[in-house]
UniProtKB/Swiss-Prot annotation:
<dbReference type="GO" id="GO:0009055">
    <property type="term" value="F:electron transfer activity"/>
</dbReference>
<feature type="binding site">
    <location>
        <position position="138"/>
    </location>
    <ligand>
        <name>heme c</name>
    </ligand>
</feature>
<dbReference type="GO" id="GO:0015979">
    <property type="term" value="P:photosynthesis"/>
</dbReference>
<dbReference type="GO" id="GO:0022904">
    <property type="term" value="P:respiratory electron transport chain"/>
</dbReference>
<dbReference type="InterPro" id="IPR036909">
    <property type="entry name" value="Cyt_c-like_dom_sf"/>
</dbReference>
<keyword id="KW-0472">Membrane</keyword>
<keyword id="KW-0349">Heme</keyword>
<dbReference type="GO" id="GO:0005506">
    <property type="term" value="F:iron ion binding"/>
</dbReference>
<dbReference type="InterPro" id="IPR016003">
    <property type="entry name" value="PsbV_cyt_c550-like"/>
</dbReference>
<keyword id="KW-0602">Photosynthesis</keyword>
<keyword id="KW-0604">Photosystem II</keyword>
<keyword id="KW-0732">Signal</keyword>
<keyword id="KW-0997">Cell inner membrane</keyword>
<dbReference type="Pfam" id="PF14495">
    <property type="entry name" value="Cytochrom_C550"/>
</dbReference>
<dbReference type="GO" id="GO:0009523">
    <property type="term" value="C:photosystem II"/>
</dbReference>
<feature type="signal peptide">
    <location>
        <begin position="1"/>
        <end position="31"/>
    </location>
</feature>
<keyword id="KW-0249">Electron transport</keyword>
C-alpha cells in the first residue's frame, strides 16, 4: 500500500465521520423543531396561558425572574398531565388538604409557593400549608430532574397567573381542555 493510498483512505474515513456527525446533528435539531412546533400548536399553552414566546416568571422570593420558552412550559404541562393531574386536575386539589394551586393560595402558603424555587423545593419536601410539618408525599424527593421540576413549576405558575378557572370550581368556564392534543 502506498503512502498516497493510505492518505486517500484516511481522507475518505474523515469525510464519512464528518458526514455521519452532520446527519446526527440534523436529526437532533429535527427533534427540537418537533417540540417547538408542538408547543406552539398546543392551544392550552398558547391561548389559555398566553405563551407564544419566552415568558418571565418569579424565580425566587426576592424578585428575580427566570425566563421560560414555550417549549419548557409545554414540557411542564406534559409532566403535569402525566404526574400531577390525577390529584390536581385544573389546579384543584382532590385529596386532603383541599388547598388548590390558585395563585392566591400559592401566595398564602408558608413559605409562599408563588415562585419557581419554592415550588421546586415543595416538590422535593412537601410541607403543610402553614409550613409547620412535613406532609404526605406520593413520590421520592428525587422523582424528577431539576430542569423538569423547574418546567413543571413554570407551568403551574403560569397557569395560576393566566388560565381562567385554574384552581377554582369554575373550571367549566375554561374553553380548552387540559388534555386537548395539539392538532
Amino acid at each position: 500500500m502506498t503512502f498516497g493510498h493510505c492518505r486517500r483512505a484516511s481522507t475518505l474515513r474523515s469525510a464519512f465521520v464528518l458526514g455521519l456527525c452532520g446527519l446526527l446533528l440534523a436529526g437532533c435539531s429535527g427533534a427540537d423543531d418537533d417540540r417547538d412546533a408542538a408547543a406552539l400548536k398546543d392551544k392550552y399553552v398558547t391561548v389559555n396561558l398566553g405563551v407564544r414566546g419566552p415568558v418571565d416568571l418569579p424565580a425566587d422570593g426576592v424578585g428575580n425572574l427566570q425566563t421560560f420558552s414555550p417549549q419548557q412550559i409545554y414540557a411542564g404541562k406534559k409532566l403535569f398531565e402525566s404526574n400531577c393531574q390525577n390529584c390536581h386536575v385544573g389546579g384543584t386539589t382532590t385529596p386532603n388538604p383541599k388547598v388548590s394551586l390558585a395563585l392566591a393560595k400559592l401566595q398564602g402558603a408558608t413559605p409562599p409557593r408563588d415562585n419557581i424555587q419554592s415550588l421546586v423545593q415543595y416538590m422535593r419536601l412537601p410541607m403543610s400549608y402553614d409550613g409547620s410539618e412535613e406532609t404526605f408525599n406520593c413520590r421520592k424527593s428525587d422523582w424528577i430532574e431539576d430542569d423538569e421540576a423547574q418546567n413543571l413549576a413554570a407551568f403551574i405558575l403560569r397557569a395560576s397567573q393566566k388560565a381562567r378557572g385554574w384552581g377554582t370550581a369554575r373550571l367549566e368556564a375554561n374553553q380548552d381542555s387540559m388534555t386537548t392534543a395539539p392538532p
